[in-house]
C-alpha cells in the first residue's frame, strides 16, 4: 500500500485533534450507497438536498421505517454524514437553504469498496497492466537518457509515484477483495452442505469452478506482464546506480519491485490454498456419500428384520475360495522350502555382519609390529591378507587393513615429499602406494 510520511504518534495526534470517527449502521451505509449510485448518474457529480431526501426515502421504505418523520430523519442522516466527512456541503448567500452536496474522497472510497470494486474484470486488469507497462517504459527510457534533477523528478519519479504505484495499489486491493470473496464462497458452500448436500453438490461445484477460474485468470494476467514490468524497473535501477543524488528514485523503484513480487507471489499462493480447499470439499462430499450409502443400507436392513413376519425374505450369501498370496514377502517366510539347502560353495554371509570381528582380528595381528617396533610394509601385509580371502572381498579387506595400519603410526618417508612406489597386492591388478610405517 502507499507509504506514510508521518509517524504513528503524529497520525494518532492528528486523528485525535480532528476528532475523526466513522459510524455507519446498515441503514446509513445503504443511504450512502444510494447517494453514490444516484451521484454516478449525474454529469456534474452534485446533488441537492431534495435529491438526498428522496434517496433517504427509498432506503427508509426498504427498511420498512415510518414515513411520518422522514424529513427529520433524513436531515439528521445528512448532517451526520457531513460531520463524518462523507459528504461536503456547499451553501451560498444567493440561494439560502438550497445547499449543494458532493461526496468526499472518504465517501467515494467506502462506496467504491462496496460497489465498483466487488466485480473482478480481466479486461480491467489487462488495461491497468497495459498502462503500467507504458508508463514504466517511458520512465525507463527517460532514466537511460539522463538529465538534471528536474528531468528525473518530472519524467521518472512522478510517473512511478503517481501512476505506477497507484495502479499497483489498485491491483493489490483487487487481490484483497478476492480474498474476501473466497471467504464468502466458503461460507456459502458450508451453508449449502449443512442444508442438503445432495442438492448442494452442483451448486458447490459451480462456486468452486468459478472461483478457481477467476483466480487463474488473475494470476495468468499478472504473470504474463510481470517479467516485462520487472525488466523496466531494473533498467531504471541500473540508470540510478551511477547517481548518488537519486536515492529517492532508487528507493521508490525498490518499493515497486517489492509490491510487484508480493502481488505475483500472493496470487500463486492464493491459488494453491484454494486448490487445497477444493480438495477438502470434494473429500467431504465423497465421505458424505459413502456414509449416507451405508446409512441407507443399514436402515433398509433394520426395516426388513422388523417386518420379517409380515414379509418373509431369504438371505443368500457366497463364500469364494481364498486366493493364495504369492508375493515375494510371503515366499521369504518359507525360503528353505522353496530354495532347498544350498551347497557350501554358494553360501553367502553378508560382509557387514563380520566387519567388526574381522577388524578386531586384523588390529590384534598388526599390533605385533608396534610392540616389536618392526617396520610395517603395507604392500606386503595387504597382499598377505588378501591371499586368504576370495576376490569379491578384496576391496573391503584391504580397506580394513589400511585403516588399522595407519592408526598404529606414520612413515617418516612421507615428510620427504617423495612419492612411494606402487606395489601389487593381488593377482588381479590391484596396487597400493604407501611408504613403510616405521614410527609408531
Curated annotation (Swiss-Prot):
Its main location: cytoplasm. One of its GO terms (biological process) is chromosome condensation. Belongs to the MukF family. It is found in: Cytoplasm, Nucleoid. Involved in chromosome condensation, segregation and cell cycle progression. May participate in facilitating chromosome segregation by condensation DNA from both sides of a centrally located replisome during cell division. Not required for mini-F plasmid partitioning. Probably acts via its interaction with MukB and MukE. Overexpression results in anucleate cells. It has a calcium binding activity. Interacts, and probably forms a ternary complex, with MukE and MukB via its C-terminal region. The complex formation is stimulated by calcium or magnesium. It is required for an interaction between MukE and MukB. Keywords: Calcium, Cell cycle, Cell division, Chromosome partition, Cytoplasm, DNA condensation. Disulfide bonds: none annotated. It comes from Escherichia coli (strain K12). Residues 208-236 are annotated as: Leucine-zipper. This is Chromosome partition protein MukF. GO terms for molecular function: calcium ion binding. GO terms for cellular component: condensin complex; cytoplasm; nucleoid. HAMAP family: MukF. The keyword Cell division applies. InterPro entries: Chromosome_partition_MukF, MukF_C, MukF_C_sf, MukF_M, MukF_M_sp, MukF_WHTH, WH-like_DNA-bd_sf, WH_DNA-bd_sf. It comes from the Bacteria. The lineage of its organism: Bacteria, Pseudomonadati, Pseudomonadota, Gammaproteobacteria, Enterobacterales.
Amino acid at each position: 500500500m502507499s507509504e506514510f510520511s508521518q509517524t504513528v504518534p503524529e497520525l494518532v495526534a492528528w486523528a485525535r485533534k480532528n476528532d475523526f470517527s466513522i459510524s455507519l449502521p446498515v441503514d446509513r451505509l445503504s443511504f450512502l450507497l444510494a447517494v453514490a449510485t444516484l451521484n454516478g448518474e449525474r454529469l456534474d457529480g452534485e446533488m441537492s438536498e431534495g435529491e438526498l431526501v428522496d434517496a433517504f426515502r427509498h432506503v427508509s421504505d426498504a427498511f420498512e421505517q415510518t414515513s411520518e418523520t422522514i424529513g427529520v430523519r433524513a436531515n439528521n442522516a445528512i448532517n451526520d454524514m457531513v460531520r463524518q466527512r462523507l459528504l461536503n456541503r456547499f451553501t451560498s448567500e444567493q440561494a439560502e437553504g438550497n445547499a449543494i452536496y458532493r461526496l468526499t474522497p472518504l465517501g467515494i472510497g467506502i462506496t467504491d469498496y462496496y460497489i465498483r470494486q466487488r466485480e473482478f474484470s480481466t479486461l480491467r486488469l489487462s488495461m491497468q497492466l497495459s498502462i503500467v507497462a507504458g508508463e514504466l517504459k517511458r520512465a525507463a527510457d527517460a532514466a537511460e537518457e539522463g538529465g538534471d534533477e528536474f528531468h528525473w523528478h518530472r519524467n521518472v519519479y512522478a510517473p512511478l509515484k503517481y501512476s505506477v504505484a497507484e495502479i499497483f495499489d489498485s491491483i493489490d486491493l483487487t487481490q484483497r477483495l478476492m480474498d474476501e470473496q473466497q471467504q464468502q464462497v466458503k461460507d456459502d458452500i458450508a451453508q449449502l452442505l449443512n442444508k442438503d448436500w445432495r442438492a448442494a453438490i452442483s451448486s458447490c461445484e459451480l462456486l468452486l469452478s468459478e472461483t478457481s477460474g477467476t483466480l487463474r485468470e488473475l494470476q495468468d494476467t499478472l504473470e504474463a506482464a510481470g517479467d516485462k514490468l520487472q525488466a523496466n524497473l531494473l533498467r531504471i535501477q541500473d540508470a540510478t546506480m551511477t547517481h548518488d543524488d537519486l536515492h529517492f528514485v532508487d528507493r521508490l523503484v525498490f518499493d515497486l519491485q517489492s509490491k510487484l513480487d508480493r502481488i505475483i507471489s500472493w496470487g500463486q499462493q492464493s491459488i494453491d490454498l484454494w486448490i487445497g480447499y477444493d480438495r477438502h470439499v470434494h473429500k467431504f462430499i465423497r465421505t458424505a456419500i459413502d456414509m449416507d450409502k451405508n446409512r441407507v443400507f443399514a436402515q433398509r436392513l433394520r426395516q426388513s428384520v422388523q417386518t420379517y413376519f409380515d414379509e418373509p425374505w431369504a438371505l443368500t450369501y457366497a463364500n469364494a475360495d481364498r486366493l493364495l498370496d504369492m508375493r515375494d514377502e510371503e515366499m521369504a517366510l518359507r525360503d528353505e522350502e522353496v530354495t532347498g539347502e544350498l551347497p557350501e560353495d554358494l553360501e553367502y554371509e553378508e560382509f557387514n555382519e563380520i566387519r567388526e570381528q574381522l577388524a578386531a582380528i586384523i588390529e590384534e595381528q598388526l599390533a605385533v609390529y608396534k610392540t616389536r617396533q618392526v617396520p610395517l610394509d603395507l604392500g606386503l601385509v595387504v597382499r598377505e591378507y588378501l591371499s586368504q580371502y576370495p576376490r569379491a572381498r578384496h576391496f573391503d579387506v584391504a580397506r580394513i587393513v589400511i585403516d588399522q595400519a595407519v592408526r598404529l603410526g606414520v612413515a617418516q618417508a612421507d615428510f620427504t615429499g617423495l612419492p612411494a612406489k606402487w606395489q601389487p597386492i593381488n593377482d588381479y591388478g590391484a596396487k597400493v602406494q604407501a611408504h613403510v610405517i616405521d614410527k609408531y
